[in-house]
Amino acid sequence: MHDSFSDAATPVVSAFYDRFPYPGDPLQDGPPPGYNWRWCLRSVEAAVHGQVRPKENGQRPSRLLDAGCGTGVSTDYLCHLNPGAEVLAVDISAGALEVARERLRRSGGAGQVASLRQEQRSLLDLAGEGPFDYINSVGVLHHLRDPLAGLQALAGLLADDGLLHLFLYADGGRWEIHRCQRALELLAVGNGAEGLRLGRELFEVLPETNRLRRHHAQRWALDTVAEANFADMYLHPQETSYNLTGLMALIEAAGLHFAGFSNPSVWDPARLLEGELLERARSLAPREQWALVEELDPDISHFEFFVSRQPVHPESWTEDSRLLEAAGEVQPCLW
């Protein structure tokens, strides 16, 4: 691994993921299950811009970066859903990368792309590797001591017309997780095997009527069956979460532009309101609508979204002449 630990938390976070390679998804032989459009560049372009760039003969391969790839789940999809691309996947954990390499070997992902590099490196130490057409960094920046420095580093690797997909923790929907994290920290259980044992025991000994126990059973029990997933949720040594205002401030501080949520239906007030209340909500500016949803839905535990270096102006297709000139393309998710 490159020895430049650019973030103060890198050594402890790397050691944590060596103990608990994350995510704990099982390996499979053959392509990954289902279809995740967020990891298909052409689907992402269609969602963000309302159109895709025409394919041209001799066009260079798309360049993709999986920044903080963990055990390779996202890398696997990126390879299978972007055939012919050049893919660089990096992570600070040797243990997680060992699993990732085996995952891609078994799935045949490397054979789908022009090139695949899986390297033990920090996303802060990739100067000279860009530009990338698409950067995927899911669940990574909030584990840096300085998330802004991480976002600025990724911004510097992004092509002028590229897109960056991020997943960051949302403060409001993680209240029960935060309480459990603080309780386990007060109990000094650590973030190793003992912490895992005592963390699971906590949810067994709390009264059945306890809200923390009930919320864990209702929301997180299935997600944390794998040991690595439980540890990542409750024992992580470095974590930051955001509200909507703080998220937008982070994006702007990095010199980037918000380009839309990758789960837009979650942020639609119609999911929560109707009648006159919905009409009033619809009259608000988009950010105010999102702020309203944030206040009304205390279960939103993360933000998933796209950012760009330049402002995005999606094609609305309201002009008949533009629509008649367009050529259709079969959505890749139909395979």
Regions found by a protein language model. Name each.
Residues L124-Y134:
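A short acidic, Gly/Pro-enriched loop at the edge of an enzyme's catalytic core
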Residues R60-G70, L163-R213:
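Conserved class I S-adenosyl-L-methionine
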Residues D133-D146:
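A short SAM/SAH-binding and catalytic strip from SAM-dependent methyltransferases
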Residues R214-W335:
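Rossmann-like AdoMet/SAM-dependent catalytic core
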Residues L148-D160:
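A short glycine-rich, Lys/Arg-flanked "PGG" loop and its adjoining helix->strand segment in the class I
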Residues R63-L65, T75-L124:
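Class I SAM-dependent methyltransferase SAM/SAH-binding core
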Residues D29-P61:
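Conserved alpha-helix/loop element of class I SAM-dependent methyltransferases that forms part
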